[in-house]
């Protein structure tokens, strides 16, 4: 099952428990996602759980859950003592999460429209690196709420309540090669994962 580290930490514990209950003989491997469409099309991995959408017709997907977004800063950040408007928040540098091999996605475009002139001074493919940096600087970052809830247990992070983000969300989906459904074991695993979420 391919995931990024930040998605894996949120979904793999529940998947492991559910799969072990239904198919205890299976070895579950969590592998990195490098080129999701190729990995699935060439059967390099059976499943990928990701927030991206793919266009290949040979691939199927099921939405596992939808997560809202939060604007995150360190505790006692100076922005928390000023009116929380996009204009005031543009004065602070932002960090951004980037997925490998991902082009311009609609969610990123909407965030860019919300903060059109935000200065981005750091980007990383690793949410844990971003959280550590945000917790020790004045950077701001937009991230999924479930991930923020987990990361704030490790770093001194706080969510900035911003009404403009309340309608934005990200879908985390299970992706697979449709031909994989011919394998009854894999089809069962896919069904177990769907039911878990």
Question: What is each model feature region?
Answer:
Residues 21-29, 112-122:
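A local structural motif
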Residues 56-98:
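Flexible hinge/capping segments at coil-to-helix
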Residues 57-62, 67, 128-178:
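Beta-alpha-beta core module
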Residues 11, 86, 158-197:
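A late-sequence structural motif
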Residues 1-2, 48, 72, 95, ...:
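Short, well-ordered beta-strand segments
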Residues 1-55:
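Central regulatory/effector-binding core of bacterial HTH transcription factors
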Residues 10, 79, 84-86, 93-115, ...:
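Secondary-structure junction motif
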Residues 34-45, 87, 127-138:
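Short helices/loops that flank or line small-molecule/ion binding pockets
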């Amino acid at each position: 099952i391919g995931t990024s580290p930040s998605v894996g930490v949120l979904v793999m514990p529940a998947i492991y428990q559910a799969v072990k209950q239904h198919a205890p003989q299976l070895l579950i491997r969590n592998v990195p996602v490098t080129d999701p469409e190729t990995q699935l099309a060439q059967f390099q991995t059976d499943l990928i759980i990701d927030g991206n959408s793919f266009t290949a017709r040979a691939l199927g997907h099921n939405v596992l859950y939808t997560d809202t977004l939060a604007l995150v800063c360190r505790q006692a950040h100076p922005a928390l003592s000023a009116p929380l408007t996009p204009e005031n928040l543009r004065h602070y540098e932002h960090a951004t999460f980037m997925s490998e091999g991902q082009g311009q996605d609609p969610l990123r475009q909407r965030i860019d429209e919300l903060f059109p002139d935000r200065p981005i001074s750091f980007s990383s493919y690793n949410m844990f690196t971003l959280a550590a940096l945000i917790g020790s600087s004045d950077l701001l970052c937009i991230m999924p709420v479930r991930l923020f809830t987990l990361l704030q247990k490790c770093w001194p992070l706080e969510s900035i309540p911003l009404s403009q983000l309340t309608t934005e969300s990200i879908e985390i989906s299970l992706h697979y090669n449709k031909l994989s459904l011919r394998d009854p074991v894999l089809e069962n695993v896919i069904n177990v994962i769907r039911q878990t979420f």
